[in-house]
C-alpha cells in the first residue's frame, strides 16, 4: 500500500508507456517487502530541466533514464560517474546529499552474463559489434572491461564510424578499438569469439529482419557467442541464424534485467536483489517462455 512514507523511484522518458522497468522493479521491491514504488514519468524533452527539479522537490530518491534523455540529462546533474562520462550517456540517477548523481549501468547489464553463465577467459578474444550508436558505446566499454584483445565496430556510415572512433581517442580503449564499414564483415565473422548486434534490425514489429543473413554467418566459428540486445522477439532472427551455425546465443532480456539489478543496488544500498523474480516478472509480462 502506498502511503505518505512510501519512497519514490521511477523512469523518465518520452514515451514511457511501454517501459518494462516498472514491471521488474516493482516485482523486486514487493519480494523484498520494502516501502518503495517505481513509477513511469512521461517527460517531453522541452520539460526535462523543470521535471528534474520537480522530481527533487517531491522527494524522488532515484530514477532510470531512457530515450530520448540519456545524453540531454548530463548537464542537469551535479555529478556523473567516470563510466557514464566514458559512454556519454546516463541511465541511472540517484539523489545524494541533495544533489542528482548520474551513472550508467548498461555496461554491468551487458557483461553480467559474460561474467557468469558464459564466463571464459576473454583476454585473447575478438569482439565484433554491429552498429555504432549509443548502445554500441556501452558494449565497447563492456568488452574492454572484460579484457578483449580486439574490439571491432562495424557500421554503414563512414563519417559516423570515424566520429565514433575519434570519441574514444583519449581513452585507453582506443588501443583495442577498430572501426570498419559493413563490407569488411566477411573478414571479421570467422575471427569473432563474440558477435553483438546493437542495431534495432530485427526488433518487433520487424521480426523477420536480421542485420546479417544466413550466408554472411556461414563462417561463424562453432561456440562463438552471438548476443543480441533486442529482447522482443525472443530469440531474434539474428540469434536463430547464428544458433544454426553452432553459436551460443544470449538475448537482450538478460541485459535489461541485469542493468536494472545494478540500478536497484545503488538506490536500495543493498546487494541482495532478487534477480530471478525480476526476470520471471518480465517473461510473464511479455508472454515469453
Swiss-Prot record:
Keywords: Amino-acid biosynthesis, Aromatic amino acid biosynthesis, NADP, Oxidoreductase. PANTHER family: BIFUNCTIONAL 3-DEHYDROQUINATE DEHYDRATASE_SHIKIMATE DEHYDROGENASE, CHLOROPLASTIC, SHIKIMATE DEHYDROGENASE. The active site is at 70 (proton acceptor). It comes from Nostoc sp. (strain PCC 7120 / SAG 25.82 / UTEX 2576). GO terms for biological process: amino acid biosynthetic process; aromatic amino acid family biosynthetic process; chorismate biosynthetic process; shikimate metabolic process. Pathway: Metabolic intermediate biosynthesis; chorismate biosynthesis; chorismate from D-erythrose 4-phosphate and phosphoenolpyruvate: step 4/7. The gene is aroE. Gene3D superfamilies: Leucine Dehydrogenase, chain A, domain 1 (3.40.50.10860), NAD(P)-binding Rossmann-like Domain (3.40.50.720). Shikimate binds at residues 19-21, 66, 91, 106, 231. It holds the Pfam family SDH_C. InterPro entries: Aminoacid_DH-like_N_sf, NAD(P)-bd_dom_sf, SDH_C, Shikimate_DH, Shikimate_DH-bd_N, Shikimate_DH_fam. Belongs to the shikimate dehydrogenase family. Its EC number is 1.1.1.25. Homodimer. GO terms for molecular function: NADP binding; shikimate 3-dehydrogenase (NADP+) activity. The keyword Signal does not apply. One of its GO terms (cellular component) is cytosol. It catalyses: shikimate + NADP(+) = 3-dehydroshikimate + NADPH + H(+). NADP(+) binds at residues 131-135, 229, 252. It is an enzyme of class 1 (oxidoreductase). This is Shikimate dehydrogenase (NADP(+)). The keyword Cytoplasm does not apply. Involved in the biosynthesis of the chorismate, which leads to the biosynthesis of aromatic amino acids. Catalyzes the reversible NADPH linked reduction of 3-dehydroshikimate (DHSA) to yield shikimate (SA).
